[in-house]
A protein has these predicted regions:
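Bacterial N-terminal signal peptides that target proteins for export
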Residues: 1-9
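Contiguous segments within soluble domain cores/interaction surfaces
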Residues: 22-125, 129-132, 138-146
């Protein structure tokens, strides 16, 4: 009887492990959305004939630690009358409000502090939506380390 239970357990675990990757790595579809590697350095995106640069330190970017966010605007956006801000969240998941308020630090650069929380689902793909008042939004999608 003990041998039968062991064999059934082995069969069950083998079947689970062979089919689990699709279930365990549910955020694979979000991995394909990543457009930024903040661990390597600042990320740059074009926005309405302008450029938005996002930098997060310290690197590597880890959840549940105090992070320093820096946004630099170029082109017409460099004369934005109001400071941009960052909303942190996860693609496809409502994480509740997590806003990084940015303050001007000179030369069309804005800085602020924030924390990326650890998601109970285990997903590590995060999104920083930078809102430039009266101009629009741009998304930087990246991985964090837990």
């Amino acid at each position: 009887m003990k041998t039968v239970i062991i064999k059934l357990t082995v069969i069950f675990l083998t079947a689970f492990l062979l089919t689990a990757p699709g279930r365990i790595s549910a955020d694979d579809k979000y991995q394909k959305m990543i457009n930024c590697n903040l661990h390597a350095g600042p990320c740059t995106q074009s926005f309405s004939e302008n450029t938005v640069i996002l930098e997060v330190t310290p690197r590597p970017v880890k959840a549940m630690q105090d992070l320093f966010f820096k946004v630099t605007l170029t082109g017409k956006l460099s004369k934005a009358p109001r400071a941009p801000y960052i909303d942190l969240g996860m693609p496809g998941m409502n994480m509740g409000p997590n806003r990084v308020q940015l303050k001007p630090s000179g030369n069309a650069t804005y800085e602020g502090r924030g924390v990326i929380v650890r998601c109970p689902s285990g997903r590590r793909t995060w999104q920083a939506t930078i809102t430039i008042p009266d101009s629009g939004q741009i998304d930087f999608i990246f991985d964090v380390i837990y």
